């Protein structure tokens, strides 16, 4: 699927078509990453999708999660599950293997770690970097996003990975953390 493919006399770009499809399903950001160097991945390609959190909900989170945030968290997880499941069906319908990492499929160990975290896929797919708050930070939405991922063997054109934090001297998340739990370390 790299580059343009001639189909019926019309040049097609399968990677762009897939990305456009994921956006049509509700993803605000879509990144495609090379996972061949990631030991915990059984698939060579990872697709990360993100949906921003509404600003008014973030403003209300200053001291503790609110009921509205919890409801939104659940709603956005359901929406992300639907988006990556649709992507899985799109790719398997074209003869590729695909695995949507939905909330009901991901397993975690006793330390609450998953074999292939969404944020690992997201950095490999160029969506952003891991900030001093240990969250994915995107240029478009900061860390106010929910993310999910989809794994595949489809030969999609990968985006450039983000390999360094862009936080620099910024300490805003450390300064504003109400629990003072952040230690100002870069990933």
Residue ranges and their predicted role:
Residues 38-41, 69, 75-187:
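Catalytic cores of enzyme domains
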Residues 3-5:
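Short hydrophobic alpha-helical segments enriched in small aliphatic residues
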Residues 8-82:
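Non-catalytic, usually N-terminal nucleic-acid engagement modules in DNA/RNA processing proteins
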């Amino acid at each position: 699927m790299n580059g343009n493919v001639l189909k019926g006399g019309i040049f097609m770009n399968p990677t762009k078509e897939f990305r456009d499809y994921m956006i049509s399903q509700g993803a605000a950001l879509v990144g495609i990453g090379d996972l061949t160097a990631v030991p915990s991945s059984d698939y060579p390609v990872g697709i990360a999708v993100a949906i921003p959190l509404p600003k008014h909900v973030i403003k209300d989170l200053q001291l503790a999660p609110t009921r509205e945030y919890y409801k939104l968290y659940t709603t956005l997880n359901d929406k992300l599950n639907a988006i990556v499941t649709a992507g899985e069906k799109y790719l398997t319908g074209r003869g590729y293997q695909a695995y949507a990492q939905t909330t009901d499929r991901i397993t975690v160990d006793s330390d609450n770690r998953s074999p292939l975290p969404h944020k690992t896929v997201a950095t490999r797919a160029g969506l952003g970097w891991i900030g001093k708050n240990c969250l994915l930070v995107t240029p478009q939405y900061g860390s106010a996003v929910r993310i999910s991922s989809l794994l595949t063997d489809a030969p999609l054109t990968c985006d450039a990975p983000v390999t360094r934090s862009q936080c620099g001297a910024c300490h805003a998340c450390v300064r504003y953390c109400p629990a003072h739990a952040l230690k100002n370390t870069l990933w």
